[in-house]
Curated annotation (Swiss-Prot):
One GO CC term, this protein: cytosol
Sequence positions that bind sn-glycerol 3-phosphate: K103, G132, S134, K187, D240, S250, R251, N252
GO molecular function per UniProt: glycerol-3-phosphate dehydrogenase [NAD(P)+] activity; NAD binding
Cysteine pairs bridged by disulfides in the record: none
Tagged with keyword Nucleotide-binding: yes
Name this protein carries in UniProt: Glycerol-3-phosphate dehydrogenase [NAD(P)+]
Positions of the catalytic residues: K187
Pathway: Membrane lipid metabolism; glycerophospholipid metabolism
Top enzyme class: oxidoreductase
Localization terms from the record: Cytoplasm
Spans traversing the lipid bilayer: none
Function: Catalyzes the reduction of the glycolytic intermediate dihydroxyacetone phosphate (DHAP) to sn-glycerol 3-phosphate (G3P), the key precursor for phospholipid synthesis.
């Protein structure tokens, strides 16, 4: 299959490596210097150092040329880049199926990725999300990984999963696109909370409680948006939550660890040097939960800490001071 990956960041590079043995690939880069580096050294020193891009992967900075001839497009930008990318596809009259790997709610609109794509390309456009417990570094290194592929057409999900599946990247088809996207978005917020918990030295009991109650928050929001409950017990729910909350490669977890040290958010993001989607998603989740009347106290506490309304320690005190509840109510 001819696949074009749009975006030469960590995920675009990692998936180019992962899919290279099975497909005819083109990696499109917006940054000319990144493309030049990839062509000359076969390494993305700016965004993803330490991993070699196979010679078989073509690198392009010409958007129209990169898209031409492809059978499948994979948008590998942060969510902030999703709309501009699909708008360029729409301008070309592109009718190709589109997948994305970004996770979150669009800043300002609060839309999930599939809503953004449908708004730009039309509801009839074949599209879907590749999501689950996966760090780009481990995917590029060929470590065994399993993810979900959810689309707006079950037959397309099954066929795309079959085509993209490799011996190192196991892909499960899923027909709950909303659930997969909500799981991938909100877990980033909860990873910040877990980082705060660990950074304050609150212990493993606290971490386990936070993750479990956080999963309940994901499910409540997802159900309010029309998702299926069982999705949150799978790879894009519990699986991604566990990885992002406990893995040291998690940018969102590292944000939480730094917040526990009372570092300012601008300083944290500057030191991180990469996008941490949970920082932006927290505010959208907080607004969406309020609008839908969904109780999400952990996510709300994260938003309050990020906005400077609470310190990390105050947020913990506030959560623990809440009235007793029935666990499964």
């Amino acid at each position: 299959m001819k696949i074009t990956l749009l975006g030469a960041g960590a995920w675009g590079t990692a998936l180019s490596i992962a899919f290279s043995g099975k497909h005819d690939l083109t990696l499109w880069s917006r940054e000319v210097d990144v493309a030049d580096d990839l062509r000359k050294t076969r390494e993305n020193h700016r965004f993803f150092p330490g991993y070699k891009l196979p010679e078989s992967v073509a690198v392009s900075t010409d958007f129209e040329v990169a898209v031409a001839g492809a059978e499948l497009l994979v948008v590998a930008t942060p969510i902030a880049g999703l709309r501009p990318t699909v708008e360029r596809l729409q301008a070309l009259g592109c009718k190709l199926p589109v997948l994305w790997v970004c996770k979150g709610f669009e800043a300002g609109s609060g839309k999930l990725p599939h809503q953004v794509v449908a708004e730009v390309l039309g509801k009839e456009a074949l599209c879907g999300a590749l999501s689950g417990p996966s760090f780009a570094e481990e995917v590029a290194a060929g470590q065994p990984t399993a993810v979900s592929l959810a689309t707006n057409d079950p037959a397309f999900a099954r066929e795309a999963a079959r085509q993209l599946h490799t011996t190192r990247l196991r892909i499960y088809a899923n027909d709950d696109l909303v659930g997969v996207e909500v799981g991938g978005a909100v877990k980033n917020v909860l990873a910040i909370a877990t980082g705060v918990c660990d950074g304050l030295g609150l212990g493993l009991n606290s971490r386990a409680a936070l993750m479990t109650r956080g999963l309940a928050e994901i499910a409540r929001l997802g159900l309010a948006l029309g998702a299926e409950r069982q999705t949150f017990m799978g790879l894009a729910g519990m699986g991604d939550l566990i990885l992002t909350c406990t893995g040291d490669l998690s940018r969102n977890r590292r944000v939480g660890l730094a917040l526990a040290q009372n570092k300012s958010l601008p300083q944290i993001l500057e030191e991180l040097g990469h996008v941490a989607e949970g920082v932006y998603t927290a505010r959208e989740v907080d607004r969406l939960a309020a609008r839908l009347g969904v109780e999400m106290p952990i996510s709300a506490a994260v938003a309050a800490v990020l906005d400077g309304r609470l310190t990390a320690a105050q947020a913990v005190e506030q959560l623990m001071a809440r009235d007793p509840k029935e666990e499964l109510a």
